[in-house]
Amino acid sequence: MSDSEKPASLDADLSRRLYRALTADRDGILSVLNDPSMEVLRSLLKNPNLDEPILLTLLKRMDLTEDTLTAVSRLPLAGESHQVKVALVHHPATPARIVQTLLPHLYLFELVTVCFLPGVTPDQKVAAERAIIQRLPVTPLGNKITLARRATSDVVDALLQEGNPQLMDACLDNPRIRESSLFRFLNGPTATAETISTIARHSRWKNRPNLKLAILKNGRTPQIWFTVFLPTLPLVEVKNLRASGRLTKGQKECVEEELKRRGVR
């Protein structure tokens, strides 16, 4: 074949594939799904025999382009099918603007899955986290406990700041929770004697110097923790606690007793 004949042959082949994609019956569509041409696949999207299972199979292809995925998102089927919405969100090449519009349609734990998808972009992760956090006020306690165990650090932080004692153990056991979240909680308005004690006795957190000090500087901390923690502090920190204006009378007495034990007046 001469060079002049090759383009005509290629054009004819592409035309046949485009026509087949547009007109094939359901069985014929299956043979089109692996076509390397995005143009052919976009033609397939106009086929009246296209259904949800076929579209979901197509969305498993990781080589789909943004243009092709945008075309999928505009299909009536994408608006009707929850599974297609999920598949679009999961696809790494789906444009961020489309993902943003689809996230509100996902269920709570589908959003959690999005946060941990391989290749998820920072913007997509943040958007999923925000969608989860926005739903927390109406989320049942049982689901919150599961979230506290499984979710990302930002979601766990939001749950922790609620101050619900029933969420504390799950939050504290989450491997992604940050010490800074606990520090903020201990210095915030929702910390109570019960929740402070939960942190103070937790094996992972009870020996963190910054958290110890935050616990001892909180006026709601039970005095038992002064008895436990004060002997472990450097003298200068104990003196600083004596000067604190945040402690209760009973807490200050514990500090004075510790200083007296160390021979400091």
Task: Describe the residue ranges of each PLM region.
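Alpha-helical scaffold segments
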Residues: 1-265
